Amino acid sequence: MSVLIDEKSHRSSGSTRSRIVVTVVGVLLMVSGLAVMLGHQSGSANEALGMEYEKPSVEVLDLEATEVEQLTKLGLSPKPKLKIVKGGDEQVLHGRFLHITDMHPDKYYKTGADVGSLCHSGKGSAGKYGDAVLGCDSPMVLMEDTLKWVKENLKDKIDFVVWTGDNVRHDNDRRYPRTESNIFDMNQRVSELMYETFKEENPRGGRPRQLKIPLVPSLGNNDVFPHNLFSPGPTLQTRELFKIWHDFVPAAQLHIFNRGAYFFKEIIPNELAVLSINTLYLFQSNPLVDNCDRKKDPGHKLFEWLGYTLKEMRARNMKVWLSGHVPPNEKNYDISCLRKYIVWMHEYRDVIIGGLYGHMNIDHFIPLDSKEAYKSIKNKFGKLGFDYELSFENDLYVSDDDDNSDSDSDDDDEDTSLEESYSNFNSPILKDGFEDSVNFKNMDDIRIQGGVPNGKVGYMENVRKEYYANVKGKKKSGYVSERYSIAHVTASVVPTFNSGLRVWEYNITGLQNLLTSDNQPRFAPWNEFFEGLEKLMETQVEADYDDEFITFGQQVEIFKNDNTFPPKMPKSKSLGPAYIPQAFTPERYVQYYADLANINRGEKEFSYEFEYATDDKVYDMDSLTVDDWISLARRLGKPVKEKKNKSNKKSKKKKKNKDKRLLENSEPLKQDGSKDSRLEQDRVQQSARLENLWQHYLKYSFVSSEYENMGMG
């Protein structure tokens, strides 16, 4: 429990909020400090605090020939494993994990039914395993055989599973209305199937129920009743969810979980964790919550939990993945939630590896711009004293005379705003003031989802225009693109397109030395942290920004004490695995898909097959750091950016001058061709290559279903 520390002193060291924190956990803070300090002292000192420490033994295991063959067949990297033994517990690390999402099993699905009836009745062409693009949910056999394939092919090759929700069918057939009982039952059924898939076949220590590898679920918008609507806890839903997920959620986090269905799971003790975030509290389509700035709303409490948890992870020198169902973007999150989410990722870039999400069924990635987020915060809170120094160009980033061949010129980069992005995604900002808001903001809040996908190519073109083409050059992004963080959205099992699964590979080189170091700090047990955290979360602040008779001075004081805004990352901290290659840095991933059309025709046995890998000749990514993703974003967005710049005479002039400088030392054409024609030829070839890259990206976004060629918008 090394850090229940108030880090808001950079705004108000003597504030009421600070005094409350110290009063609640003052004694815990003293023990916390001792835990860190004594980490490098003698063992007897640690034992005196009840923190016995046993150094694990770590053994490198070479692969057998059959293992190499299996991995190669799956397109995975054959690399040595690590066997960790501590306190009688054994863990084998492969440097891989699985991300699975959006199974949407439908017990009413009938093979041969009419797709117009959502495959529930009539006579038609509904395939045994479901059909891409036709709009039905998953047959039960698709979910069952998917998990059977995972068990047979991946279970013994991965370290953990990230499972990002939507385990219930869509509520889109009035003939078969969903009830709360139905939803609990299906969640229970899917959870039991997941447990059976990943359980330890030979449990140790007489424990009858034991997972072979950790599994981290998160709550989907269709896992609740009614869909999208989720109240602040504790509620019947949070209590039932804890019962359903009792194999996955640590018992010590029961009280925190009951507040809002968020928790975290240690993957490698004191080294790596996955945070499960209830994104329904950030979701614009949840009409039971308003925003993430009002203290009475659950989104505000979620960010309190996130802040305290990340501080503890930093103090323990742990690294984390964030996971959740709904990805952070302008279509999904309330602006007050999105900007906070982005700046927390930015200020904990020494800790956070990345974010893993589902919900959208489209395989793509989203660059999150910290400068845009901070500008948006200033727009709202500047009058209350928000004066965060945006020193990106002068502090984190490269100098004007730095020349980097991977960068587009920053000269044509215009600063954009988060507010503009909401407008461009046709996602209006319905509330971002301090006044009271009304629930059920528009009918989109209760819209029915699922069905035939329409307009998804248009969405991806907007992603290209608003995200990729607006990525800044190196001078404004940083040596390793520190300005940005990345949200990864993976393909779903439900056949919105073809079914998809993703296996990530990450760096475990050097982990052996890290785990066996004599300088490993000792920490108090996690249950002490949770006890202190519960007390902090129970602390209520009466005044809120939108209280009826609130004064401006009181609003200023509330903002000073608002700990849902992160402190700046300490300059003493180094960038983490997301930015600099080290232990836990993502190296590559392999995407698998089920070719449903050929499987349903009987031309293939049911199986998932290799679709692509990030290091293949299409993407050609050496690793998966943020800088690698930003480089890919620049390539994907460059044609759009150049088209935009051509309409700017000043930009064209700068481009011409740059071309002249590039040609000063080039050799003349051997025949009668001019330098201008040579440049034009190069541009045409590059444009063709980039367009080919975009077409491949669209193909993979829609999971090789040919959706991008179907004319569905």
UniProtKB/Swiss-Prot annotation:
SUPFAM superfamilies, per the entry: Metallo-dependent phosphatases
Catalytic activity: [phosphate](n+1) + n H2O = (n+1) phosphate + n H(+)
Pfam family, one: Metallophos
GO BP annotations listed: polyphosphate catabolic process
Ranges for region Disordered: 399-430, 640-684
Main location: membrane
Alphabetized InterPro entries for the sequence: ASMase/PPN1_MPP (IPR041805), Calcineurin-like_PHP_ApaH (IPR004843), EndopolyPtase_N1 (IPR012358), Metallo-depent_PP-like (IPR029052)
Glycosylated sites: 507, 645
Gene3D superfamilies named among the record's database cross-references: 3.60.21.10
Basic and acidic residues: compositionally biased ranges: 660-683
Keyword DNA-binding: no
Function: Catalyzes the hydrolysis of inorganic polyphosphate (polyP) chains of many hundreds of phosphate residues into shorter lengths.
Family as reported in the entry's similarity comment: Belongs to the endopolyphosphatase PPN1 family.
Protein name: Endopolyphosphatase
Gene (name only): PPN1
